[in-house]
A protein has these predicted regions:
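Cross-kingdom TIR/SEFIR domain
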Residues: 33-34, 52-157, 161
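Conserved N-terminal substructure of TIR/SEFIR domains
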Residues: 1-65, 90, 163-172, 176
């Protein structure tokens, strides 16, 4: 039986660090669009002059599920970490999250101790320990979720597998 989740505007919110995966995400976005899956992707859906955080928060609220692409540079971005916390606060077990580990090892150790420790330590200086503690907790929570692990394949060759996974997940929660 499907759990119906209303999608106000977007089927899928794509969270990623554009600096190192934008081309791959562009391919994924095109492939999702070909399947009739409506996505939110920051470069397309944020209008010039629009306040960045409120627009992201609204897009997160208006999405049915989330694909979070963790790459080597993901935690460099405080925006990505803020998105992650917002996604977890919004989902609360009702919306689905698909973590994609792109050239990073999955699991709790990945989330902080090796891959992102330097970035998180730098963020503590700028944002304080309390905020970064929330980010660490969010990373740990998502690191322990089942997801896709991609060690090779740059560009779009991994996209079809993600698209199929998204279609399966949406079929469970979205009314036809």
């Amino acid at each position: 039986m499907a759990i119906l989740v209303p999608c106000e505007r977007f089927d899928v919110f794509l969270s990623f660090r554009g600096k190192d995966v934008r081309e791959s995400i562009n391919n994924l976005n095109k492939d999702l669009d070909k399947e009739g899956i409506n996505t939110f992707m920051d470069s397309e859906n944020l209008m010039m002059g629009q306040d960045f955080p409120p627009a992201l928060k609204d897009a997160i609220k208006q999405s049915c599920m989330y694909v979070i692409v963790f790459s080597k540079k993901y935690a460099e971005s405080s925006w990505c970490l803020k998105e992650l916390v917002q996604i977890l606060e919004r989902s609360r077990g009702k919306q689905l999250i698909l973590p994609v580990f792109f050239h990073v090892p999955p699991g709790e150790e990945w989330s902080q101790k090796r891959t992102y420790e330097k970035e998180l330590a730098e963020h503590e200086i700028e944002f304080g320990k309390r905020k970064v503690k929330k980010w660490r907790e969010a990373l740990t929570q998502v690191a322990n979720m089942p997801g896709r692990h991609l060690q090779d394949g740059i560009d779009g060759d991994w996209s079809p597998g993600i698209v199929e996974h998204v279609k399966e997940m949406l079929a469970k929660i979205k009314p036809k």
